[in-house]
From Swiss-Prot:
GO terms of molecular function: 1-deoxy-D-xylulose-5-phosphate reductoisomerase activity; manganese ion binding; NADPH binding
Protein name: 1-deoxy-D-xylulose 5-phosphate reductoisomerase
Record organism: Listeria welshimeri serovar 6b (strain ATCC 35897 / DSM 20650 / CCUG 15529 / CIP 8149 / NCTC 11857 / SLCC 5334 / V8)
Gene: dxr
Gene3D superfamilies: 1.10.1740.10, NAD(P)-binding Rossmann-like Domain
Secretion signal, residue range per the UniProt entry: none
Length: 380
């Protein structure tokens, strides 16, 4: 029985994680969790799973819940996330919060000796050198929840990492993959949130449409697998059936295929190296797909991916700037303050004004993160 700590319980990844826990009560117990502002959904989760510790974001929500659930210990804010992440009775932390707020709870959980299932890619994007060093020192494995990195982990199972030629991350191309740059000036939030293949949260769906999401995943792959940026390739795979691939020095490829359902990589991160049966509404059959399509990325059409590669190669605090600027720009788009095509421009503006600080410590990363957010907000 694994005792699970789940950060971001009401989000897309959190909801699908709860489904796995619900379907496997003999294997998993949810002992602690966090959620943000969705009180209705949060209450239902507490009532069903009966966690011992819960963190919410606002003080008023904590006070309300304390009166409703006197047997549960409640916390709030970032400190609440950090308390829950290190809950003594938990075995595995699955960090599914969105944004750089997930960094400190992950580091705290590593220090506490928890196993880590990481869905919060910003943790590695902003502080990969710190997080991976801490994990090595504590002999903690970071198991990826992203479908692409889970696919690579599976493709590398039993292989010699020194024989890797390159990693190939696949991308659907997002909601606007068939639109020209000129056509993006008129797109709406509603249109942007219609992903062709995946069911994801709002921020992630927008990041998929710009391909900033894939850029963050390139950085994440760099840290998780120790592969240079020049040896990480992104290709468009429209069907989202091939989740990613590894090419080896002999020219061969190993790929992981499956239905576009996040329950698959979630359960693999929780049970690695074992697997669980997952009930699907429709069983996946490879014969349902008469063809699988692979396309080169047009970096003029998707400049966000080029910005991310450049930021990753420069390193230091540059990825932190890219991530923070993108979070504010996407929030501005979702709130109607920014046109879709201006998301990239805002991020590029923030990158151009920043001089990267190499090997930043945690305080420097957090300071640059806050300064970047404040700056981009002035541009909205």
């Amino acid at each position: 029985m694994k005792k699970i700590i789940l950060l971001g319980a009401t989000g897309s990844i959190g909801t699908q994680t709860l489904a796995i826990i619900r379907e496997n009560p003999e294997k998993f117990q949810l002992v602690a969790l966090s959620f943000g502002r969705n009180m209705e959904r949060g209450r239902a989760i507490i009532q069903e799973f009966k966690p011992k510790m819960v963190a919410v974001w606002h003080t008023r929500d904590r006070i309300t819940l304390e009166s409703e659930f006197p047997n549960v210990k409640f916390f709030n804010g970032l400190e609440g996330l950090r308390e829950v992440a290190t809950y003594l009775d938990g075995d595995v932390l699955l960090n599914a919060v969105m944004g750089s707020v997930g960094l400190l709870p992950t580091l705290d959980a590593i220090e506490a000796g928890k196993s880590i299932a990481i869905a919060n890619k910003e943790t590695l994007v902003t502080a990969g050198h710190i997080v991976m060093r801490a994990a090595r020192e504590k002999n903690i494995s970071l198991l990826p929840v992203d479908s692409e990195h889970s696919a690579i982990l599976q493709a590398l199972n039993g292989e010699n990492p020194e024989r890797i030629e390159k990693l190939v991350l696949t991308a659907s191309g997002g909601s606007f993959r068939d639109k020209t740059r000129g056509e993006l000036s008129e797109v709406t939030v509603k249109e942007a949130l219609k992903h062709p293949n995946w069911n994801m949260g709002n921020k992630l769906t927008i990041d998929s449409a710009t391909m900033f999401n894939k850029g963050l995943e390139v950085m994440e792959a760099h840290w998780l697998f120790g592969v240079d940026y020049d040896d990480i390739e992104v290709v468009i795979q429209r069907e989202s059936i091939v989740h990613s691939m590894v090419q080896f020095v002999d020219g061969s490829f190993i790929a992981q295929l499956g239905t576009p359902d996040m329950r698959m990589p979630i359960q693999y991160a929780l049970t690695y190296p074992d697997r669980l049966f997952i009930p699907y509404e429709k069983n996946f059959r490879i014969t349902d797909f008469s063809a699988l399509h692979f396309e080169k990325v047009d970096y003029e059409r998707f400049p966000a991916l080029k910005l991310a590669y450049n930021a990753g190669k420069i390193g230091g605090t540059m990825p932190t700037v890219l991530n923070a600027a993108n979070e504010i720009a996407v929030a501005g788009f979702l709130n109607g303050q920014v046109a879709f095509y201006n998301i990239e421009a805002l991020v590029e503006n923030a990158l151009n004004r920043h001089t990267s600080i190499s090997e930043p410590d945690l305080d420097t990363i957090l300071q640059v993160d806050q300064e970047t957010r404040a700056y981009v907000k002035t541009l909205l």
